[in-house]
Amino acid sequence: MFKNVIGLIVEYNPFHNGHLHHIQEIDRLFDDNIKIAVMSGDFVQRGEPSLINKFEKAKIALSQGIDIVIELPTFYSTQSAEIFAKGSVNVLDKLSCSHIVFGSESNNLDKLKRIATISMTKEFELSLREFLAEGLSYPTAFSKALFDEKLSSNDILALEYLKAIKGTNSKIEPYSIQREKTGYYDDEKDNFSSATYIRKILLGNEKKENKLNKIKNLVPEFSYKILEENFGVFSCLSNFYDLIKYNIIKNHSELKNIQDLEVGLDNRLYRHSLENFNFE
């Protein structure tokens, strides 16, 4: 019986040095642990296909110290941060995890807990709806409802994890780790970078050798090996543009029924699908 059953909520799209740091910090902080990763599969929270398939991602995770990989169902993995978090926390709770450990830009767990409590009140919900009714995007409306409190991408996810734990009366203990060096859209710093930056390189227009050289120091050796083996078969949204365009035009009247679709976005998608011949 392990003393600490640690839950991680991950996408590994792709697995990079920051992810390895996350695992190493868990081993440093929690002795006698088993690490269970709930991972999005072939489709990720951005609603995009994963760069490499879920089996390759799981293979990398297991090679780098994760003990068990559980796939997060696509219904949850492609949703908003709130539903993504609820589904993930529910899985970890059912697996009797003692802790959930996540990266955070602020690494201020007490502050995030206070914000989580506020954001679950009726007053906050009313304020949020009012800002959304003004046509603001969800992140902007959320920030304004919190009196212009600015949260970075991983802090927003951390907040949703805390809300999910509180909302389900889970006994899981949350723990935050300082996110190393870079933010979601940042470039390379001291061999740390965001997954977004790595995908940008790999899906860019440079030669294969140049791309691989640029990411070699940003990912662990085994992750690099898998990415090299899968080079040329990476998945990205633009690969599916013809199918997406066909469905938008064919099912234009039904687009408004998509969950969380902002008012008017259905018409914009339809108009641009008629006018454009490629994803860019």
Label for each model-derived stretch:
Residues 28, 62, 92-93:
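Non-catalytic positions within long, well-ordered alpha-helices that form the structural scaffold/packing
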Residues 72-280:
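Active-site cores that bind ATP or allylic diphosphates and position pyrophosphate for catalysis
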Residues 2, 69, 83:
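Contiguous, function-dense segments enriched for cysteine-driven chemistry
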Residues 1-57:
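N-terminal catalytic cores of NTP/NDP-binding nucleotidyl/phosphoryl-transfer enzymes
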Residues 59-73:
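A glycine-rich helix N-cap at a beta->alpha junction
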Residues 8-9, 38-39, 70-72, 175-177:
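Short beta-strands and strand-loop turn motifs
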